[in-house]
């Protein structure tokens, strides 16, 4: 047990103190302003040289501490200057600067782990498509899978206690507690104020969510590495089981010099894989459902007793991988059995051999993607293309370039699809929506406008894959077409398109 406690104990040399004085440094707010997550209309005309001085920050913190966040009413929350709609720019800047400061201990710890383990910085592993190439290699050998939504409705004080392991500055923790209580009281405000609050503080709450996930996965990794020591306590009532363990321990003492942990390592599940994505995760295993049920019990107890989150065990389903599909990152992935019949003849005897091979398939779910196109006003609810009136004021080249960019980005992201039929339909919707937008701008019919543009306009919607393969195989069109129909994974995709992120 002392060894396990040492494993979970944090390296005290990596714990950093006195983060609170950084709130009064102007360069912190300049750093928060330059970060990509904090691009906002509020900051376009803000001069950080004279609007984030230490005097203003001190006044803001004093004003926040003078208010009692526990007795806000609905009316007070709406009129609160700290969370009001564009009423106090300085409070917005303060929250963004605070988010940068509390990230410092985590960033330094991450760099320390990279240096200690000498992990090579491979930019290809950052690609979203690298996950699917990994699944292609592993999932065809697995049998069971569980798709679980990570519970995140935890108590505010648990978030603060989690950060206490990393941030030892009491003043910073008190200020964080004040932010969280004000955030909690904002739930009683109208929806538009909540939406503005989330958009105005993306970095702070993204950090809080990631810290919660980091704590959960840190313990989960500990359970995974030490799973051979977690025997069932209920088995103690069976004397045969106790006698079995005693015999094994005696056998180990005699032949393996007390190296019991190495022997128990073989009782682990070496084929258990864990993948997290967009607030969810799935586990897949090769062995019987017994091991999956064991991990199900561990996770439920972890969330209930460590994070005080009530989680029903029935929400974790264990499914056979060959009969289940995973919807994540814009793809619907599954493992299918492809059977083939081989005819063999030996002398006068004829044999028919059935071969069943597992294949990892990824398709594009058309219904959610059409829903995203509908929300962006590219089509109606039935998938029929419509024009975009908001684009009629732009030039023809800008309209065409915008539609081409969206079409090529979607084709580039969904290049790993096993079946291209859904992708062809999406390209058809975007292409016809572009034509209708241009026809509406020039006040002409679609047929007349298509005749004016000619076939060259339709060729503009060729994807990068088609153009690339046509250059390699200029005379073998059937070969290039067959290659394009196959799966192509790119290692330069690090983010999800807004139209793909429909979950």
UniProtKB/Swiss-Prot annotation:
Subcellular location as annotated: Plastid, Chloroplast
One Gene Ontology molecular-function label: RNA binding
Superkingdom of the organism of origin: Eukaryota
Keywords: Chloroplast, mRNA processing, Plastid, RNA-binding, tRNA processing
InterPro entries attached to this UniProt entry: Domain_X, Maturase_MatK, Maturase_MatK_N
Pfam families for the chain: Intron_maturas2, MatK_N
GO BP annotations, alphabetical order: mRNA processing; RNA splicing; tRNA processing
Cellular component GO terms, alphabetical: chloroplast
Entries under HAMAP family matching the protein: MatK (MF_01390)
Family: Belongs to the intron maturase 2 family. MatK subfamily.
PANTHER family given in the database record: MATURASE K
Biological function: Usually encoded in the trnK tRNA gene intron. Probably assists in splicing its own and other chloroplast group II introns.
Protein name: Maturase K
Species of provenance: Kunzea pulchella (Red kunzea)
Lineage of source species: Eukaryota, Viridiplantae, Streptophyta, Embryophyta, Tracheophyta
Gene coding for it: matK
């Amino acid at each position: 047990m002392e060894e396990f406690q040492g494993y979970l104990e944090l390296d005290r040399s990596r714990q950093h103190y006195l983060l609170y004085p950084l709130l009064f440094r102007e360069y912190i707010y300049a750093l928060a302003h330059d970060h990509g997550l904090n691009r906002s209309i509020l900051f376009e005309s803000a001069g950080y040289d004279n609007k984030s001085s230490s005097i203003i920050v001190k006044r803001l913190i004093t004003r926040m501490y003078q208010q009692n966040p526990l007795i806000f009413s609905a009316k007070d929350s709406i009129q609160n200057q700290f969370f009001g709609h564009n009423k106090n720019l300085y409070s917005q800047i303060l929250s963004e600067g605070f988010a940068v400061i509390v990230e410092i201990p985590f960033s330094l710890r991450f760099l320390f782990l990279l240096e200690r383990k000498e992990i090579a910085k491979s930019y290809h592993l950052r690609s979203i498509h690298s996950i699917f190439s990994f699944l292609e290699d592993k999932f065809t050998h697995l049998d069971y899978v569980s798709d679980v939504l990570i519970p995140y409705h935890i108590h505010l004080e648990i978030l603060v206690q989690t950060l206490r392991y990393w941030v030892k500055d009491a003043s910073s923790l008190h200020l964080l507690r004040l932010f969280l209580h004000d955030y909690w009281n904002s739930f009683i405000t109208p929806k538009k104020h909540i939406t503005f609050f989330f958009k105005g503080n993306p970095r702070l709450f993204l950090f809080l969510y990631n810290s919660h996930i980091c704590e959960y996965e840190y313990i989960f990794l500990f359970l995974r590495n030490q799973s051979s020591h977690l025997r069932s306590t209920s088995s103690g009532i069976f004397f045969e089981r106790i006698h079995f363990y005693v015999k094994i321990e005696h056998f180990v003492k005699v032949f393996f010099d007390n190296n019991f942990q190495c022997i128990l390592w073989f009782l682990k599940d070496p084929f258990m894989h864990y993948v997290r994505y967009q607030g969810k995760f799935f586990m897949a295993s090769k062995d019987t459902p017994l091991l999956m049920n064991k991990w199900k019990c561990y996770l439920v107890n972890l969330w209930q007793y460590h994070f005080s989150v009530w989680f029903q065990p029935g929400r974790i389903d264990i499914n056979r991988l060959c009969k289940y599909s995973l919807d994540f990152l814009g793809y619907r992935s599954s493992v299918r059995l492809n059977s083939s019949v081989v005819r063999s003849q030996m002398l006068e005897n004829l044999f028919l051999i059935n071969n069943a091979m597992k294949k990892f398939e990824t398709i594009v779910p058309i219904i959610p993607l059409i829903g995203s196109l509908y929300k962006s006003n590219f089509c109606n609810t039935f998938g029929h293309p419509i024009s975009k009136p908001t684009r009629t004021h732009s030039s023809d080249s800008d309209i065409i370039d915008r539609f081409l960019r969206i079409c090529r980005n979607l084709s580039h992201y969904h290049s790993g699809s096993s079946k291209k039929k859904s992708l062809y339909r999406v390209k058809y919707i975007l292409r016809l929506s572009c034509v209708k937008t241009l026809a509406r701008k020039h006040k002409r019919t679609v047929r007349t406008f298509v005749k004016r543009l000619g076939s060259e306009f339709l060729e503009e919607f060729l994807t990068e894959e088609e153009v690339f393969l046509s250059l390699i195989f200029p005379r073998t069109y059937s070969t290039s077409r067959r290659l394009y129909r196959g799966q192509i994974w790119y290692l330069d995709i690090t983010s999800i398109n807004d139209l793909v992120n429909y979950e």
